UniProtKB/Swiss-Prot annotation:
Cytoplasmic side: 1-32
Organism: Arabidopsis thaliana
A Pfam family this chain is assigned to: GDA1_CD39
Primary residence: membrane
Family listed: Belongs to the GDA1/CD39 NTPase family.
Gene giving rise to this polypeptide: APY5
Membrane spanning stretches: 33-53
Name of this chain's protein: Probable apyrase 5
Length: 488
């Protein structure tokens, strides 16, 4: 029965007519309004219930994931500094899931590198202890004992004599044993350049979603570190066994060329060039001045206090380091000098072809990412993504040919010890990629990068090491998600 609105009427009005006018027409409006109100109320109630239930499910899933997170820590002991990486991961259907977003990944770098403690191994404990404390602040205390921590040293440490390496590693092992993390002495080690290249290749192709597919459609990596350079990719030609590694992903096997060119990292190569200049009679004016075409004009310095900062000079060269360097600032001459250095020993090549020295290198093919100092130098010059090698030549010529005083005015926030190196690095990059490895100046298949993929995953070899060192079953990853489930 419809609800009626009833009014008390004056005595002189006719109740039937008044009742008719008040009840019948307005009952439809009232009924419609009330019905709409009821429907709206029900809709709002159902909506709120849905939101609350959805949020509850999401909260529960998030809470369960956080409570079931596993953690792993890797310390990258590089030549210029030591960086700690803290990873969080979880399991789905019994398989680990890796996510390198900010919620599950953190890192911190401290300088100098562990190799700088060659004369004082105990000094290495200070930076490692600070890094360990950083990791502890990002992992629940109750999970420290179950979280593994590994230290992997690279080219800077590889350059040291083995006894010195072990002295430094023993100091770090002592710190890690008492850290509260899960640790074994063999987890602090000096890794090979080949392993470093493989790790970088893994994380790059994980980020790009190309793992599990055609090996020849994967992306290669060329890295320019401080002490070494790495070239890693899947070639189409036969590779001598000493230069190849095979890894399996799901049902796909990848035969990878990976080689580390020790002493050809940016810092080591610059010091090596200085050594060559010192030994060259033609480069010296005979009055204790050595001309350096890879340093901008107007920059004169004592080689021992300025150039030996990376610690890569030999003892014989350090003796000569009291010579004064006369900056010549000539990109073309610098390019020629660095190319001669890269080609030294090529006459002893025992393989089909050698691109750098007497080391076998397959013909470069497919897509590549140029990382580390390739990226840093390109960003410094503000190069575009296309034909950046051609742009590098122009930028290098301008920079090398500029007076030092003007460069300091143009780049006031860049420290001198870094600023003057961009002349060398621009010429060295061209000598390595174009003149030695044969990459065309207009080849758009090679790009400089520090991150890759839609999720901008850092192209850091330590991330690849984390993936490969995590105990994982065979993968069913389909290449479409940034989450990589199971790699072995």
């Amino acid at each position: 029965m419809d609800a009626l609105k009833v009014q008390i009427l004056p005595d002189n009005q006719s109740s039937p007519s008044s009742t008719h006018m008040l009840t019948k027409p307005k009952s439809k409006k009232a009924t419609k309004s009330i019905a709409m109100l009821i429907v709206a109320s029900l809709a709002i109630t159902l909506g709120l219930l849905f939101v609350f239930s959805s949020n509850s499910v999401m909260f529960s899933a998030s809470f369960l994931r956080r409570s079931s997170l596993h953690y792993s820590v890797i310390i990258d002991a590089g030549s210029s500094g030591t960086r700690i990486h803290v990873f969080g991961y979880w399991f789905e259907s019994g398989k680990p899931v890796f996510d390198f977003g900010e919620e599950h990944y953190a890192s911190l770098k401290l300088s100098p590198g562990l190799s700088s403690y060659a004369d004082n191994p105990e000094g290495a404990s200070v930076s490692v202890t600070k890094l360990v404390e950083f990791a502890k602040g990002r992992i629940p205390k109750g999970k420290l004992k179950k979280s593994d921590i590994r230290l992997m040293a690279t080219a800077g440490m590889r350059l040291l004599d083995v006894p010195v390496q072990e002295q430094i590693l023993d100091v770090t092992r002592r710190v890690l044993r008492s850290s509260g993390f899960k640790f074994q002495d063999e987890w602090a080690t000096v890794i090979s350049g080949t392993d470093e290249g493989i790790y970088a290749w893994v994380v790059a192709n994980h980020a790009l979603g190309s793992l599990g597919g055609d090996p020849l459609k994967t992306t290669g990596i060329v890295e320019l570190g401080g002490a070494s350079a790495q070239v890693t990719f899947v070639p189409s030609e036969h590779v001598p066994p000493e230069f190849s590694r095979t890894i399996s992903y799901g049902n796909v096997s990848y035969t990878i060329y990976s080689h580390s060119f020790l002493d050809f990292g940016q810092d080591a190569a610059e010091d090596k060039l200085l050594e060559s200049l010192q030994n060259s009679v033609a480069a010296s004016t005979g009055d204790g001045i050595v001309e350096d075409p890879c340093t901008p004009k107007g920059y004169i310095y004592d080689t021992h206090s300025q150039k030996d900062s990376s610690g890569f000079l030999s003892e014989e060269s350090k003796f000569k380091a009291s010579l004064q360097v006369q900056a010549a600032g000539d990109f073309t001459k610098c390019r020629s000098a660095t190319l001669a250095m890269l080609q030294e020993g090529k006459e002893n090549c025992a393989y089909k072809h050698c691109s750098i020295g007497s080391t076998f290198t397959p013909n470069i093919q497919g897509s590549f990412l140029a990382t580390e100092n390739f990226f840093h130098t390109s960003k410094f010059f503000g190069l575009g993504e296309k034909e950046w090698l051609s742009e590098m030549i122009l930028a290098g010529k301008r920079f090398c040919g500029e007076e030092w005083s003007k460069l300091k005015e143009k780049y006031p926030t860049t420290k001198d010890k870094y600023l003057h190196r961009y002349c060398f690095s621009s010429a060295y990059i061209i000598s390595m990629l174009h003149d030695s490895l044969g990459v065309a100046l207009d080849d758009e298949r090679i790009k400089y990068a520090s991150k890759a993929g839609k999720e901008n995953i850092p192209l850091d070899w330590a991330l690849g090491a984390f993936i490969l060192n995590t105990d994982t079953p065979t993968s069913d990853y389909n290449g479409k998600s940034r989450k990589m489930i199971g790699f072995k």
